[in-house]
Curated annotation (Swiss-Prot):
Disruption phenotype: Knockout mice show no overt abnormalities, however male mice show reduced fertility. Reduced length of spermatozoa tails and significantly lower motility. Reduced ability to penetrate the zona pellucida likely due to impaired sperm motility. Spermatozoa show disorganized fibrous sheath, loss of thickening of the longitudinal columns adjacent to doublet microtubules 3 and 8, additionally ribs that circumferentially connect longitudinal columns are torn, this phenotype is first evident in step 16 spermatids. Its EC number is 3.6.5.-. The gene is Irgc. This is Interferon-inducible GTPase 5. The lineage of its organism: Eukaryota, Metazoa, Chordata, Craniata, Vertebrata. It comes from Mus musculus (Mouse). Pfam families: IIGP. Disulfide bonds: none annotated. GO terms for molecular function: GTP binding; GTPase activity. One of its GO terms (biological process) is positive regulation of flagellated sperm motility.
């Protein structure tokens, strides 16, 4: 049976790292201590994979905060671990809801403004304001008078990152005949509500607020994709990895962003692989490299939503059968990644080591000049990273096929 040719890895791939990461690696390489450098690289990789992200979700009582949290976590109200929902305020104290697939990301359901036992003047202290990396402020319907704690609005006005969401605006949607065709009327209504919310927040002292009109029941429509993009943009660089992976795959653009970010992570992993090879311990490099590759491939499988639960939820959202979506997936990562899968991928890789080595030298040029041994090991061993780079494209392409099959139409 013929083996399909793997897509080539681009020649101009570069390892992107934060300034502090580069300085730490420079110090480790200059010391000439291989075990120290290997330990430092493993630490940097682990930190990027386990960075915590805390998101506070607050707003008016009964505004739909819990439903929005469930939508962002890809859960329905009846799913195990879902946030409690109801027509009245159900949150009396900050309640953490870890992401079901990425436990380092936690969305906090905060008490609504005006809820019993939560006074407006002490709101920041009661919800532990400093805990959160940024806020989602939820307001129902037309945003009214934006009934949010003044202290919270003032803190946001001073630069605290936040986004306002209106998840229940669809309840006021009625396409009057006088406004023309349905699509035109809906677009006009969307803009009217955005303008109204913007003006109310400016009156409250918030300059240039971001407004997103979303539907908790239809996370693929309206402003939800723009909310996802803003989430990624607002996160600090060191928390972007966790934040982006945790977001639901609600568009082809979201899938592409995940692929780009994971591609950078692959090349960081290549550094670890190359330095481990330089350690004088027989068999260590091969064993570590295999384990690292298996973990990476399993991460891609989970991140792109190719597991059964994720496909079932996506099918439910768009009114399709899960089997129809799975039928278009052609990735070997559509099933659980095993050591046998890794061996098969290794056998299909022939020229990855030199390309990863070139990316290694472009990202950390000090290694080639100051530590020839590590540079040589980077050329000879990271075949697994070439496998990762190539097969990272495969699940990304597979994950996009269900979206293309759905072919959503109308106003997004």
């Amino acid at each position: 049976m013929a083996t399909s040719r793997l897509p080539a890895v681009p020649e101009e791939t570069t390892i992107l790292m934060a300034k502090e990461e580069l300085e730490a690696l420079r110090t480790a390489f200059e010391s000439g201590d291989i075990p120290q450098a290997a330990s430092r690289l493993r630490e940097l990789l682990a930190n990027s994979e386990t960075t915590r992200l805390e998101v506070g979700v607050t707003g008016e009582s009964g505004a739909g905060k819990s439903s929005l949290i469930n939508a962002l976590r890809g859960l329905g109200a009846e799913d195990p671990g879902a946030a409690l929902t109801g027509v009245v305020e159900t949150t009396m104290q900050p309640s953490p809801y870890p992401h079901p697939q990425f436990p380092d990301v936690t969305l906090w359901d905060l008490p609504g403004a005006g809820s019993p036992g939560c006074s407006a003047d002490k709101y920041l202290k009661q919800v532990d304001f400093g805990r959160y990396d940024f806020f989602l402020l939820v307001s129902p319907r037309r945003c009214g008078a934006v009934e949010l704690p003044p202290s919270l609005l003032r803190s946001c006005a001073r630069g605290r990152s936040f986004t306002l969401c209106a998840p229940r605006w669809t309840r006021i949607w009625r396409p009057p005949a006088a406004r023309g065709p349905r699509v035109s009327a809906r677009l006009q209504l969307l803009q009217e509500i955005r303008d109204h919310c913007t003006e109310r927040l400016r009156v409250a002292g918030v300059n240039d607020p971001r407004i997103f009109l979303v539907s908790n029941l239809s996370p693929t429509r309206y402003d939800f994709p723009m909310l996802v993009t803003t989430w990624e943009h607002d996160l600090p660089a060191h928390r972007r990895h966790a934040g982006l992976l945790s977001l639901p795959d609600i568009s082809l653009e979201a899938l592409q962003k995940k692929k780009d970010m994971l591609q950078e992570q692959v090349l960081k992993t290549a550094l670890v692989s190359g330095v481990i090879q330089a350690l004088p311990v027989p068999g260590l490099a091969a064993a570590y490299d295999d384990a690292l590759l298996i973990r990476s491939l399993r991460g891609y499988h989970r991140s792109f939503g190719l597991d059964d639960d994720s496909l079932a939820k996506l099918a439910e959202q768009v009114g399709k059968q899960a089997g129809d979506l799975r039928s278009v997936i052609r990735s070997p990562l559509a099933n659980e990644v095993s050591p046998e899968t890794v061996l098969r991928l290794y056998s299909q890789s022939s020229d990855g080591a030199m390309r990863v080595a070139r990316a290694f030298e472009r990202g950390i040029p000090v290694s080639a000049r100051w530590w020839p041994g590590v540079s040589a090991s980077a050329r000879s061993t990271p075949c697994s990273r070439a496998v990762s780079m190539r097969w990272l494209r495969t699940p990304n392409a597979s994950a996009s096929k269900p979206w293309r099959k759905m072919s959503p139409r109308g106003v997004r």
